[in-house]
Amino acid sequence: MGIVINLFLLVPASIVFFAAGFFLGRFFLERLGTTKVLEAEERAVQIVQEAQKEANEYKDLKVTEVNQEWKKKRREFDQEVVIKNNKFNQMQKQVQQREGQLKKQAQDNRDMERRLQDQRKENEQVQESVTLRAAELERIISEQNERLESISGLQSEDARQMLIDNMISKAREEATETIHQIHEEAEQEAERLAEKTLLTAIQRITFEQATENALSVVHIQTDELKGRIIGREGRNIKAFENATGVDIIVDDTPEVVILSCFDPLRRELAKLTLQKLLSEGVIHPVAIEKAYEDASKEIADVIMSAGEDALSSLQLPDMPAEVVKTVGKMKFHTVYGQNLLQHSREVAMLAGVMATELKLDARLAKRAGLLHDIGLVLPATDEPHAISGRNFLKRFNESGVVLNAIAAHHGEVEKESPIAELVDAANVISLSRPGARGAMTADGNVKRLESLEEIAKGFPGVIKTYALQAGREIRVIVEGDNVSDSQADVLAHDIAHKIESEAQYPGQIKVSIVREKRSVAYAK
């Protein structure tokens, strides 16, 4: 019973303690929550302050960077303005110079017209003077005839003297006729012997093809290669033509690509380049340039080999290497449509055979015949090619007979030996072959194309010039570092104007300026 009473007493006490603990716990929890809130608010304020500070620092940094970038752009703009002003001033100077040249040319034209008028007046005065002089002479002759008619009666002594004079005059006429007949017979005999010698020389020599073609044919294995040669949108053909200066023709002819150019050396270089590209199987602009560089190195061996073969065929050893190389260059030049080396070999063989028939030195005749046109492959000078060829061979102690034959074969100097006459005759025979005179037109066209290229080469900044499309286009390669886009436009106009003033041509000529700038860097 006592235990039950104690339990009833403990239950209310437990409830009281539980309630007290509950309220105490709630009180402490509320106090703790208030503390956490205060701490959180303080932390939030601190974070906001730090963020504001960082934002201000970031803002100051960006303002500094923007100011620096603006100053940099300003400096670049100022520099660009200076460069543009310099270019403008330069172009303005060029325009002023051009205006000065045009004014000077106009003044020269006026002076020339004035001189022509003065010359015309002077010619009229001379003609009038000649007319008066002729009338005076006619009057004097008429008076003399009247005087002779009035003196009809001559004395016996005068008549005898007149008879003697007539007999002497008749004897002189008969003697002159006899001498003239002897001369004609001697000339006929000399012509007969000369014809026999020439016929013997011509019959002993087999002439090769006379006309040099302006086309080269490159055979390919399959027509599928034509698409690779053309390239995407024709870029490979453009790169090939820019590198070689040769037109490449890809048509429906099976397994054939045609190269067209008036310059045989360029055409041979282009042929070697294309053959290298086809053998390697890789065709793109960079590969084209590399193949062209390799072909340019190999062409020197081809030239030397051509010179050595020419000397060997004529049995002419012992020539300096420089002379042999120059002879080899003849393979890539033409004269009146004929390959120059072939023409020189023909002249050498003809001169050698005629020298043998006439018991002269055949070796000297062949040597002079082979070298007579060597001046055509030397750098251009103001001298005729016969004189420049003689001066070139003088440096190698060439025989005086050979030097005279070379210099005299176009009449620039007097012929001093029979060898010189033989070389001149052999040259005329070779150039008189069937088709030679018709080839003169082609040779004139070649010279016209060369003159167009030389006109364009005379301008600053020009690297290479090519006459394409039979002279209807002049493609000019310029230095990208020295010629700007605006200057390229001016250059094209100047070249076209100079061609108009200095060259004669049918139709119109397109002047194309090709400007390329390459930048190379290496990653290490």
UniProtKB/Swiss-Prot annotation:
Q: Where are the stretches annotated Disordered?
A: 96-127
Query: Where in the numbering of this chain does the KH domain appear?
Result: 214-280
Q: How does it sit in the membrane?
A: Single-pass membrane protein
Task: List localization entries.
Answer: Cell membrane
User: Function, please?
Assistant: Endoribonuclease that initiates mRNA decay.
List all Basic and acidic residues biased stretches: 100-124
Q: What is this protein called?
A: Ribonuclease Y
Q: Which organism is it from?
A: Chlorobium phaeovibrioides (strain DSM 265 / 1930)
Which residue spans traverse the membrane?
3-23
Question: Which family does this protein fall into?
Answer: Belongs to the RNase Y family.
